[in-house]
Amino acid sequence: MSKMDVGPLVPSGLMVVSVEVGAAAITLTVRRPSLESACPTCGVVSRRMHSRYWRSLADLPSHGRRVQLRLEAHRFRCIDRHCRQQIFAERLGCEIAHASARRTARLDSLIHHLGLALGGRPAASLSRRLMLPVSKDTLLRTVRRHFVRSRPSRSGKSPPT
């Protein structure tokens, strides 16, 4: 099989370790290039690695196949003795994926917009054709999660957007 350019498949901020191309899916093993992370409680940057674990993230399809990111994530020890957070997991950043997400931010955004534009069943039907197998309920949950209510101010006018 010829070499495939995986650059566009990988969200920025991740480095490709290996690529497995199957008949139905492309699996990219990725990791963050830096081996340090800031403690979410105190903000001190730590390089003291505690352990590592694997996360699996679904991403946008490519070349007629599903794309799965197998991410090597790390846990670090906080180096501030007074911090109550002794061990923490590195944050990927909202441009890659949210804390406990199983989909990348760009796939989640596409699913959100499909659900917003078409609603439950029509969006689920189109998403299957686009190789994004999500249920109508997942589409509607994603729309609700992204929905931000704008509360009127005390004067009765909506806040500026």
Language model features: what each stretch is:
Residues 1-81, 85-89:
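Short, conserved DNA-binding cores of transcription-related domains
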